[in-house]
Amino acid sequence: MDDQLRQSALDFHQFPVPGKIQVSPTKPLATQRDLALAYSPGVAAPCLEIEKDPLAAYKYTARGNLVAVISNGTAVLGLGNIGALAGKPVMEGKGVLFKKFAGIDVFDIEVDELDPDKFINVVAALEPTFGGINLEDIKAPECFYIEQKLRERMNIPVFHDDQHGTAIISTAAILNGLRVVEKNLSDVRMVVSGAGAAAIACMNLLVALGMQKHNIVVCDSKGVIYKDREPNMAETKAAYAVEDDGKRTLDDVIDGADIFLGCSGPKVLTPEMVKKMARAPMILALANPEPEILPPLAKSVREDAIICTGRSDYPNQVNNVLCFPFIFRGALDVGATAINEEMKLAAVHAIAELAHAEQSEVVASAYGDQDLSFGPDYIIPKPFDPRLIVKIAPAVAKAAMDSGVATRPIEDFDAYVDKLTEFVYKTNLFMKPIFSQARADAKRVVLAEGEEARVLHATQELITLGLAKPILIGRPSVIEMRIQKLGLQIKAGVDFEIVNNESDPRFKEYWSEYYAIMKRRGITQEQAQKAVISNTTVIGAIMVHRGEADALICGTVGDYHEHFSVVQEIFGYRDGVHTAGAMNALLLPSGNTFIADTYVNDDPTPEQLAEITVMAAETVRRFGIEPKVALLSHSNFGSSKSAAACKMRQTLELVRERAPELMIDGEMHGDAALVESIRNERMPDSPLKGSANVLIMPNVEAARISYNLLRVSSSEGVTVGPVLMGVAKPVHVLTPIASVRRIVNMVALAVVEAQTQPL
């Protein structure tokens, strides 16, 4: 580690507060009543319920989502036996990973005890606190004994990640690697360097899946492990001891090996050894920070080799974060009493299968130009793949149920998967009613920027979820090339249609129709022809206008108002409406908030604001939410006579005439809109109850400023929109920062709007 990295790491751990974790309350503690419920006397009620039924602890406490990361510091991350206290930063780091990737809370516990039996007694006594135990950085062979005894004594999952996490990921990699080179697990020969916890667990798991034990040769620091090599050999080693054939070194046994599994130290495997391996060898060089052989060195003598390491700077990283958060997620969610072989194997297969799936846009963004299509350089998923939790946790949970170790079986697996998806995509629950309705009658949606990577990823999602029938505008050769480069599994003409923006036989009809619409607005025939050829939003809008598509999504490239101008000119406003407006939804920890008008009208009149307010309320109801509207101003219920304040008061009168059933009040300050007690101090008889969820701003400046401040200030907040309201056809103009998920969400909303369009 160089000095700069060392200092950066020290600063990272020290500032702004020491360490990486904290405890945050999940219940309010703002009033005397809150304290009475959280502690004495109210806390007695759940205590008595748990006394009657111990399983009630999962209902009334955090036990069901709490894991202990426990270590004695005897084998810390390549640092060796540095002691329990010195290992604490690692254990805190493990806790951060549990929380980040699976939403699991962690207490890190460092036990200053080297005697295995005493250590076991300490850990076993902690069972009432936790839903699971993650043993970490405990040296072999004691780790095997400790885990086995704790599994026997405890009625919650006990999992030594250094063993089983590495084994699960390595096994998934080997299964996929053998698939790439067309070899069978039962036929291949494997040489192993290292006989510690990870190596033994890897071999055990591979044998459980069908690798033949007689095809495995293990080398430790003394050389080949053969029968009767030494008296009192550890049972874990003896299980893999081979007959003595005179071979003593790694170099002696590597000849013809299909797989090298390294869980030992740097530079153990030489290029000369790699040369002697079988056709298309697999090399898992997992020592950290320096592997048994560096991939470029191995590739220099064997281009056909498939190589995995524990490092992030090479392809095929064997990283335990691919496994442990999600195997615990599945185990906790069914109240598993153990993590058994069936659950581990389920995780292996789920991880292996995910590598065959199309590329995730999150992974593509994180790893730049790397080719992440299944093949020699991509046989296991990347740690940042958001689908890991959705694939692995349900597989593990189901295996726990099928093998009889689940105390709280999941009754509705579809609902469970939806819940896990919400962890990945925070908009999932919010969009659920829209998605359900869109799936019922998928419509043709034209995406104007069809060559964009985000649009292509969104198209994959739309097909996978069954939300729409996409039509992409773009050059077919470019679209096909980018689909292949992005590792997507969609096909033009099968999953979606392409409209070639450079040459389409319908273009003469398109520009003629566009000219007919625009000829009295200063557009010549020549300009109409040029617009159709050069502007994909014009093409998409004309397609919807002609009935060749049901809805349009545009704006992922370019200026919002340029796109809006096109759709407004071609479609006009819907019946009974004389303006358009844009609304953004913010999904915040405190609740969902809708803000309008965020894009269209710079300084709307009272009449325009009234129309926007009514349309906003209609749109909010599509999400299954009852709108509570506040008209915002610097004025609070008549405190100012300014023109801006009067505008909002006039808006209130107009809205009450047009939508008397709508819960609305104003004009008011922002804090009064969100906090009922503040509002009641000024207007105790306000018809607006609770916190307002629809905020109508006096102008676009106030709307955009408020939206962006809320969006950025809440690190956990996510957005949906902008939702375009008032245009005669289902169309939404997005912005260049739109994510793949935002595109998917807006397509689904456009489909639902198209379903209700008059024929």
Language-model-detected regions and their locations in the chain:
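Rossmann-like adenosine-cofactor binding region
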Residues: 237-306, 311-313
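NAD(P)-binding Rossmann-fold cofactor-contacting core
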Residues: 193, 209-237
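Adenosine-phosphate binding glycine-rich loop
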Residues: 161-162, 178-184, 285-393, 400-403, ...
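A short, aliphatic-rich alpha-helical micro-motif
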Residues: 127, 185, 253-254, 274-277, ...
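N-terminal ligand-binding/catalytic initiation module
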Residues: 1-158, 398-399, 406, 432-456, ...
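Anion-binding alpha/beta catalytic cores of soluble intermediary-metabolism enzymes, centered on
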Residues: 85, 137-184, 407-410, 417-759
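Glycine-rich adenosine-cofactor-binding loop
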Residues: 66-78, 83, 167-171, 181-207
